[in-house]
Design a protein with these regions (language model features):
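N-terminal basic, amphipathic alpha-helical segments
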Residues: 1-112, 122-125, 306-313, 317, ...
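Conserved core of the PLP fold type I
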Residues: 107-242, 254-266
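Proline-centered loop/turn at the N-terminus of a beta-strand
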Residues: 164, 211, 243-245, 271-273, ...
């Protein structure tokens, strides 16, 4: 047997015997050449063959990693954020190709399981623990993105007499459209950079009309703010007291380097519905989301889901499961943290030059300013065509996105305020 074949056989045996785990990094080319007393070219030939067999995958300037082991049961490992490349497309493509090997019987044929692929549910359950979301597998449902989950929730009834949905103002624009286009009765509660008025929240809950309170507690878009722990605790307490379900949309959780606690963590009475989206972290075409439901809502949710589709794309579900379990998702998330932190520092540096005396929050790729009513005149709105404006009852807001001309836009904004 030739030397490169010996290397291949040893690594395959290691995978069979679980000595090499999913996501584990192999020894370097240099280390293997010394171990097997051969040239680096010989080792490289072995690596290329293993890569062709979809047993390993390469990370630029890092090395080779095990794509999948035999029992599919191992957990994600800690990896250096510098290992990951610019975008997850290539790694996800590898997982997509691997998901098609030897699984035709249940991926290409009919697989009726509305709650989602069992492997992905297991992967998501483990992943959510990183966000302090502790849920059981039988509470999880895989959906075709968070938008489908929100649509289904708006169709559901909870308790007799409760017909309205409470949303924050401002909030996720697609949620507003979803409610309005269906003619669903709703109320709003003002939110600014400091949070919401808890007394007003209790007053609205007391009406007995609210079935769901839709909120983005962490890295709110467009405000960029996060509820403090006291506010989160109070919201959960009020939801229990007035029998209201909370829809917690945590779609930017992967960008929260502070790892703040979600409402779901504080909930001990099954009042919080937790929604996790993978689109912001990976790419828009991946329309897969996950929702953790209180037991009393799960059956109703699945019945409504069955009216929309038979099941969420099984091949993409399997690919995402592989992507999570072999460590690729963890590396991509860490890489995004690195990019986000670099953006945050650049925005912060620009802001510190002007010593602004107005409230603001830095969020994912933007900064949002809270301004007194009336400052956002038509002239400034024309000046910043690519910025986002929104008006509240007590304040106006301007969101400037981080682009190449961010410093120039910020300078124009400061000059406008000083006129």
């Amino acid at each position: 047997m030739k030397k490169y074949q010996v290397i291949i056989q040893d690594i395959l045996t290691g995978i069979e015997e679980h000595r090499f785990k999913r996501g584990e990094k192999l020894p370097s080319i240099r280390q293997l050449s010394e171990q097997y007393h051969c040239s680096k070219d010989t080792v490289q030939k072995a690596m290329l063959e293993l890569k062709y067999q979809n047993k390993i995958y390469a990370v630029e300037k890092s090395g080779y990693y095990i794509l999948e082991d035999r029992d599919f049961q191992d957990h994600t490992v800690e990896l250096n954020p510098a290992d990951f490349q610019e975008l997850p497309y290539e790694d996800f493509r590898i997982c997509l190709n691997e998901s098609l090997i030897g699984r035709e019987n249940y991926l290409f044929n009919y697989y009726h399981q509305q709650e989602g692929l069992a492997e992905l549910i297991s992967s998501v359950q483990s992943l959510l623990m990183d966000y302090h979301v502790y849920t059981k597998k039988d509470q999880l449902v895989i959906t075709a993105g968070s938008q489908q989950a929100l649509y289904i929730l708006t169709q559901m009834e909870t308790l007799a007499g409760k017909t309205e949905i409470l949303i924050e103002n401002p909030t996720y624009s697609r949620m507003i459209e979803l409610i309005r286009h269906q003619g669903i009765p709703y109320q709003t509660i003002e939110r600014d950079l400091d949070g919401i008025d808890l007394e007003e929240l209790e007053s609205i809950f007391q009406t007995g009309k609210i079935k769901f309170f839709y909120t983005i507690p962490r890295l709110h878009n467009p405000l960029g703010s996060t509820y403090d722990i006291a506010t989160k605790t109070a919201i959960v307490k009020l939801a229990k007291q007035y029998d209201v379900y909370i829809i917690e949309d945590d779609y930017l959780a992967d960008f929260d380097s502070s790892h703040s606690l979600p409402l779901h963590y504080l909930d001990t009475d099954n009042r919080v519905i937790y929604i996790k989206s993978f689109t912001p972290t990976l790419f828009p075409a991946l329309r897969i989301g996950a929702i953790s439901l209180p037991n009393q809502l799960r059956d109703s949710f699945i019945k409504h889901k069955s009216l929309i589709d038979y099941d969420t794309n099984l091949i993409m579900q399997k690919a995402l499961s592989l992507y999570i379990d072999n460590g690729m998702f963890a590396r991509n998330t860490q890489h995004l943290h690195h990019i986000y932190h670099a953006q945050w520092n650049k925005i912060k540096d620009c802001l510190e030059k002007y010593a602004l005396n107005i409230p603001y929050r830095i969020s994912k790729g933007s900064v949002t300013f809270q301004l007194s009513k009336g400052i956002l005149s038509p002239s400034i709105q024309h000046m910043f065509e690519k910025c986002y404006y929104f008006s509240g009852q007590k304040a106006d807001f301007l969101q400037i996105f981080f682009e190449q001309d961010f410093a120039d836009k910020l300078g124009q904004f400061v000059r406008y305020l000083n006129v």
